[in-house]
């Protein structure tokens, strides 16, 4: 039978398990918080780091001493001060030796102490270590009773509760740790800036954060990088908590036909090898486009992660995607939590600076008291020796006649009024001290000691002198370490788009029948006079030809409308830039076109303002108007922009400011009921013009119609539209359309044979939508069919494209003005070729003014 361990008469206290667990967990929490995970606000060290440095100091491995095996150091730390696992202690030692972890390392390691690639250090039996100058500055004056000592874990030894720390180590090297219910993450800083900030605080106790930040600009990470924005820094310095955005530092190297992104500096605590692998994975999974190869060329001179781009990739866009998708951009969460007076607290920057200065003030006071006591003790001895020398004969006689040392000591104390210490010093004095030279040295030393006592006493009585000592020591530290900033701080990029990194230049965008697209700076095409023969705009495949082109800005958004009525988005700068004769890139690689889907219209726009609308014109004379804002949120698969009849296709789309819709007969919505429309008389034309803009459409057979924009009311994206013009000839079709602001504007029309003219808009009478129109250009075999129209603008040039792929730029003002019912003059000398498209482009300086143009006679067709 099992024996009952409790006797019947034994007193047993009942306890609540819940209360016991709470108390035990609280004790454990405080043990972790105070004794393990959080740094002291004064010296910036956790207990393990402090014990490592103290053990190294005991072993005498200073910055000028020989290296000592890491295993020996770890063994001393574990055996004397830190009864935990050797791995944890060695890891802490290793981190203090890594220049990519510490802004200024406290340990000088010899051997493999890890790398920025995440490689672990070699085993402690292979590596060696010693203290750096920084560690010596943290420990300086430790032997002068400057800090309190506490018993070690078994009360056999004592260890410092805090180090004297002549350096603001908490802010210099930062700290990170996870305790129970709390964590700290303090970033490192530049020592030069910290010293300047401390000196400013010494000079003005009431200085504000704004003034301090003129010196301490922000964190300074050992791996460099770029901090974006000061908002997070200010918040962290003000409240002790904040978020700092940190990016890798890169540069672009230009190579023939492609760019190379080179990463020079990494964000703090980013693993380079993992970053390399992550980028490679993103490229493999096609989550980032434009990268052909990633390789690591880092060496002892520094980091060099090379990212080679494809020929048509834009480095700015690829780099922006890398920042978004990888650890080339990270957020450093600041929590300035530290221990003060055995309590954890989140500190502001000013509080930490003041704590350090107060700590240094305490250290200097205790050091001064220690030195004063030592000086007074020495002066006391020297005064006794001086009395003995002044009475040397009597002293010698007394000693000679004394029975023993004790009687001699008592005799000296009684006869000359000396203390026991003084008497012992006299008895211990060598005979050589009786020489005249030694007497002079003694008197000089006494004088020097008395002056030192006076100086030390003055220091203790003057706070100003104490602050001057702190100031001098800080300046000494600054000159000794020379630690300039290596992390750049730039303006925040929250409001900066990738477009801000790309010049907003004039571009010519071309697209071929087979769907190859490219952009070329418009300055690549020199302006020529009328009749110029142009330059080759693109080299096409044998079965391909340029189908359309237009001019726009790099930052514009392109809206692609296809034969299926779908609309897609694409930024102009995302189109690969090519040479004037380059073939371009397949547009299916840029937007998500479906199989056999063909682009029919491309509309550039700078915004999606609700005050604007899109007017769609089809080959069969249908017009539809939809507010531009309907297309501002486009998915990658596109949206439906217009419903087309089976035998119809889109010709062009123009942008116009939205006008209030006028009421009209809904029977026109399907294109019927045209016979009910009445042509607006000339008298009513002006009144109608006052109400808003006009749409102007032209046909292949030289007809045109001008009607009020507000006669086409805005409808939804998936609607069909209404009739714009009825054709006189069966084979006729709409070939172009423009928006007219007022009747004083001029319209430029061009035919297939390069014949063109400028005509004022008031020569085309205003009609109701759905009419048959009037003659726009008199067509002859010499002119052939009409190609299109553009609005004349003195700030713009005309760009004409031929079927052979040639482009020519012509000054619009050089083209003769002619009436509505005329043919015009030669605008482009086609030499058997034909003009297939025209567009406007911004003016450029002409370098080709010697080209002579031929004119044709204007023909009156009225």
Swiss-Prot record:
Write out the catalysed reaction.
ATP-dependent breakage, passage and rejoining of double-stranded DNA
Tell me the active site.
126 (o-(5'-phospho-dna)-tyrosine intermediate)
Segments carrying the region annotation (Disordered) are: 843-862
Biased region (Acidic residues) positions are 845-862
GO cellular component terms given for this protein: chromosome; cytoplasm; DNA topoisomerase type II (double strand cut, ATP-hydrolyzing) complex
On the tree of life, the source organism's domain of life is: Bacteria
| Localization (cell) | Cytoplasm
**Which principal EC class is assigned to this enzyme?**
isomerase
UniProt EC number: 5.6.2.2
Write out the residue ranges of the motif GyrA-box: 528-534
Write out the entry's keywords from A to Z. Antibiotic resistance, ATP-binding, Cytoplasm, DNA-binding, Isomerase, Nucleotide-binding, Topoisomerase
Q: Which Pfam families match?
A: DNA_gyraseA_C (PF03989), DNA_topoisoIV (PF00521)
Domain Topo IIA-type catalytic, residue spans: 38-501
Biological process, per Gene Ontology: DNA topological change; DNA-templated DNA replication; response to antibiotic
Which GO MF terms does the UniProt record name?
ATP binding; DNA binding; DNA negative supercoiling activity
Q: What else is known?
A: Few gyrases are as efficient as E.coli at forming negative supercoils. Not all organisms have 2 type II topoisomerases; in organisms with a single type II topoisomerase this enzyme also has to decatenate newly replicated chromosomes.
Task of the protein: A type II topoisomerase that negatively supercoils closed circular double-stranded (ds) DNA in an ATP-dependent manner to modulate DNA topology and maintain chromosomes in an underwound state. Negative supercoiling favors strand separation, and DNA replication, transcription, recombination and repair, all of which involve strand separation. Also able to catalyze the interconversion of other topological isomers of dsDNA rings, including catenanes and knotted rings. Type II topoisomerases break and join 2 DNA strands simultaneously in an ATP-dependent manner.
Stated family: Belongs to the type II topoisomerase GyrA/ParC subunit family.
Q: How does it assemble?
A: Heterotetramer, composed of two GyrA and two GyrB chains. In the heterotetramer, GyrA contains the active site tyrosine that forms a transient covalent intermediate with DNA, while GyrB binds cofactors and catalyzes ATP hydrolysis.
Q: Which HAMAP family match?
A: GyrA
Q: What is this protein called?
A: DNA gyrase subunit A
The source organism is Campylobacter fetus
């Amino acid at each position: 039978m099992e024996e009952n361990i409790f006797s019947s008469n034994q007193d047993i206290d009942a306890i609540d398990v819940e209360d016991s667990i709470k108390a035990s967990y609280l004790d454990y929490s405080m043990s972790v918080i105070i004794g393990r995970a959080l740094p002291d606000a004064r010296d910036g060290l956790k207990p393990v780091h402090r014990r490592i440095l103290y053990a190294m100091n005991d072993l005498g491995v200073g910055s000028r001493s020989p290296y000592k095996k890491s295993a020996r150091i770890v063994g001393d730390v574990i055996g004397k001060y830190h009864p935990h696992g050797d791995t944890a202690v060695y890891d802490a030692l290793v981190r203090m030796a890594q220049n990519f972890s510490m802004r200024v390392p406290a340990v000088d390691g010899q051997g493999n102490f890890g790398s920025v690639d995440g490689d672990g250090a070699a085993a402690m039996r292979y590596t060696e270590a010693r203290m750096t100058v920084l560690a010596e500055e943290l420990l300086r004056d430790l032997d002068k009773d400057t800090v309190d000592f506490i018993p070690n874990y078994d009360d056999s030894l004592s260890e410092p509760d805090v180090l004297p720390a002549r350096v603001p180590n908490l802010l210099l090297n930062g700290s990170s740790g996870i305790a129970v219910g709390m964590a700290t993450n303090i970033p490192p800083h530049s020592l030069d800036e910290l010293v300047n900030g401390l000196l400013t605080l010494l000079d003005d106790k009431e200085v504000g954060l704004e003034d301090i930040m003129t010196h301490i600009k922000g964190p300074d990470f050992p791996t460099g990088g770029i901090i974006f924005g000061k908002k997070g820094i200010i918040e962290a310095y003000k409240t002790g908590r904040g978020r700092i955005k940190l990016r890798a530092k890169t540069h672009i190297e230009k190579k023939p036909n492609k760019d190379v992104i080179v990463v020079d500096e990494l964000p703090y605590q980013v693993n380079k090898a993992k970053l390399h692998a992550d980028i490679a994975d993103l490229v493999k999974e096609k989550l980032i486009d434009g990268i052909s190869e990633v390789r690591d060329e880092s060496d002892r001179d520094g980091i060099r992660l090379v990212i080679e781009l494809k020929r048509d990739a834009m480095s700015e866009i690829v780099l922006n995607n890398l920042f978004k998708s990888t650890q080339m951009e990270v957020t450093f969460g600041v929590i300035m939590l530290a221990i003060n007076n055995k309590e954890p607290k989140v500190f502001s920057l000013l509080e930490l600076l003041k704590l350090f200065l107060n700590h240094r003030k305490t250290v200097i006071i205790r050091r001064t008291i220690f030195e004063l006591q030592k000086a007074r003790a020495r002066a006391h001895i020297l005064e006794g020796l001086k009395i003995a020398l002044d009475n040397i004969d009597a002293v010698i006689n007394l000693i000679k006649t004394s029975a023993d040392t004790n009687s001699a000591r008592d005799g000296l104390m009684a006869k000359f009024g000396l203390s026991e210490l003084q008497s012992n010093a006299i008895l211990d004095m060598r005979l050589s001290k009786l020489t005249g030279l030694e007497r002079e040295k003694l008197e000089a030393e006494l004088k020097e000691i008395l002056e030192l006592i006076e100086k030390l006493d003055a220091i203790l009585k003057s706070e100003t002198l104490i602050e001057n000592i702190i100031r001098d020591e800080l300046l000494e530290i600054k000159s000794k370490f020379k630690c300039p900033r290596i992390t750049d701080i730039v303006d925040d990029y929250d409001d900066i788009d990738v477009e801000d990194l790309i010049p907003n230049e004039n571009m010519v965008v071309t697209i071929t029948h087979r769907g190859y697209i490219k952009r070329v700076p418009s300055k690549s095409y020199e302006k020529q006079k009328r009749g110029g023969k142009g330059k080759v705009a693109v080299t096409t495949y044998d079965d391909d030809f340029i189908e359309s082109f237009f001019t726009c800005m790099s930052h514009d958004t392109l809206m692609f409308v296809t034969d299926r009525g779908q609309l897609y988005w694409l930024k102009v700068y995302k189109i690969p830039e090519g040479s004037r004769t380059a073939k371009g890139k397949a547009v299916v690689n840029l937007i998500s076109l479906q199989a056999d889907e063909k682009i029919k219209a491309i509309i550039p726009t700078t915004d999606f303002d609700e005050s604007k609308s899109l007017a769609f014109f089809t080959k069969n004379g249908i017009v539809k108007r939809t507010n531009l804002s309907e297309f501002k949120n486009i998915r990658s698969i596109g949206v439906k922009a217009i419903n087309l009849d089976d035998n119809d296709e889109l010709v062009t789309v123009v942008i116009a400011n939205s006008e209030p819709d006028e009421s009209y007969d809904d029977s026109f919505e399907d294109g019927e009921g045209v016979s009910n429309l009445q042509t607006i008389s000339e008298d009513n034309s002006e009144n109608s013009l006052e109400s808003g803009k006009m749409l102007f459409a032209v046909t292949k057979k030289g007809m045109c119609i001008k009607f009020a924009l507000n006669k086409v009311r805005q409808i939804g994206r998936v609607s069909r539209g209404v009739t714009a013009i009825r054709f006189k000839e069966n084979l006729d079709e709409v070939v172009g359309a423009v928006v007219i602001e007022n009747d004083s504007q001029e319209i430029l029309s061009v035919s297939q044979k390069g014949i063109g003219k400028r005509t004022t808009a008031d020569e085309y009478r205003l009609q109701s939508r759905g009419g048959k129109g009037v003659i726009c250009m008199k067509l002859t075999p010499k002119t052939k069919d009409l190609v299109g129209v553009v609005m004349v603008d003195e700030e713009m040039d005309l760009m004409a494209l031929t079927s052979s792929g040639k482009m020519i730029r012509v000054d619009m003002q050089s083209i003769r003005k002619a009436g509505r019912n005329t043919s015009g003059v030669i605008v482009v000398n086609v030499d058997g070729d034909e003009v297939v498209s025209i567009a406007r482009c911004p003016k450029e300086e002409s370098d080709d003014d010697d080209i002579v143009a031929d004119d044709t006679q204007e023909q009156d067709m009225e």
